[in-house]
Swiss-Prot record:
This is Ornithine carbamoyltransferase. GO terms for biological process: arginine biosynthetic process via ornithine; citrulline biosynthetic process; L-arginine biosynthetic process. It catalyses: carbamoyl phosphate + L-ornithine = L-citrulline + phosphate + H(+). The gene is argF. L-ornithine binds at residues 162, 224, 228-229. It comes from the Archaea. It is found in: Cytoplasm. GO terms for molecular function: amino acid binding; ornithine carbamoyltransferase activity. Belongs to the aspartate/ornithine carbamoyltransferase superfamily. OTCase family.
Amino acid sequence: MKHLLTLMEFKPHEVEDLLRISRDFKARYMAGEVYTPLFPGRIVMLYFEKPSTRTRLSLTAAAAQLGMQAVYTAPGELQIGRGETIADTMRVVSRYAAAVAARVYKHETLEEMARYSSIPVINALSDRHHPLQALADALTLWERSGRLHGLKVAFVGDVSNNVATSLAVVGAKLGWEVRLVGPKPLWNQKLVEELAEDLAKTGGQIYFTDSMNEVAGVDGVYTDVWVSMGFEKEAEERRRLLKPYQVNQRVMDIAGKRAVFLHCLPAHRGEEVTDEVIDGPQSAVWDQAENRMHTAKAVFAYLLNKRA
């Protein structure tokens, strides 16, 4: 049974396959073929412990466009909120649904869900990884640059978070140079070690730096909120630590005119990014958000073993 818990478990050619399927789905969509009913009448369970806009809606839209129905659930709506085990829950859900997409606080929850599931489990965000976002990021950069391999991308700010981690993973699979630009207390050198085998195969490079000048010459400048869900108690300390890493027009000028601006959203305007940048001519965030839907379709099709 193939799951999508992280992209680390996927080989480089499998990541490329997902992105090519995504591009094909988007081309069909843009040509007016919105409805591609590959899985008519099937059910996708969305299990969300955290609130969501893009992830929930993109998965719901993707399921509908493939002929499926998405059923949204939260812990308080299921017996799991009253003590039923994850194991028992997944054994039951596997009899009803074709796949489960789960947005959870702890990555270990996803691992346990997958352990007892006989249907694909998809990571819709955990504290450690956000693979659906990384696929949309890669598709967006491919569209904007015209290249899938050999890109240079700088992630600026909280380089320890799930979005930065998944960006590094997809970059390692595609032979990118990923520059993780942020304060030293947030560096995770273990990540580079974990991706060493893929980097050796693809010729990619990942490194940490605290210099904002390292955004020079990149294809994309990426940032995310300074205070992620679950870190509210550390809000003031994180804002103090990350204040020097705001993406403003000066940063984009250093990056150069070729660079596009990326943000997974929601954005805290005036903190990690200025209005001038996110609403500016180099911003690709709205294409990036749309691409969440097309890459979600690709993930469903890939894991359920059927392509358009």
